[in-house]
């Protein structure tokens, strides 16, 4: 006859597994600095970081990125440093055009946006896009800029790609963007 300890082992193992799962949330929000210009972003998971050249108009611009994927969506912030407000305006126009071009035939809505401490020129802009293909991932983008002490401008693109499993995750991400 089995001992009472062995009869309860499967139940204890199941309870332990449930307890561990409860300690591992899908959205584990954390503050993450982006670049060296002071932006802090809330990301729902441990970020990966990368650098790459991004063609913006006739220029190839170095872009730093931090982002992660969890709960059915990718959350990312990209950063580029422009030398002047005029260059920042040109780059942001090119960045927006390149993004719209990549989205192809998606239904897009672009509108002015607001972000505390973002500069007015280039102005913050929000883009929401839903590709026409059934099941295709929606895209939410916010572009904004910040003046630097040396006269340059930091440009940012914050993106949520996909449909997060938590309905408030995209709002938490965008509301968690903090400029110094």
Task: Report the location of each language-model feature.
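Secretory pathway targeting signatures of secreted, lumenal, and periplasmic proteins
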Residues: 42, 46-88
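Bacterial signal peptide processing site
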Residues: 24-26
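Bacterial N-terminal signal peptides that target proteins for export
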Residues: 2-15
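Coil-to-beta-strand transition motifs
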Residues: 72-75, 136-138, 149-156
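Predominantly extracellular/luminal regions of secreted and cell-surface proteins
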Residues: 34-43
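Signature of long, low-cysteine stretches enriched in small and polar/charged residues
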Residues: 46-48, 52-54, 59-65, 96-149
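Surface-exposed amphipathic alpha-helical segments
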Residues: 2, 39, 47-48, 91-107, ...
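C-terminal motif of bacterial Sec signal peptides marking the signal peptidase cleavage site
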Residues: 19-22
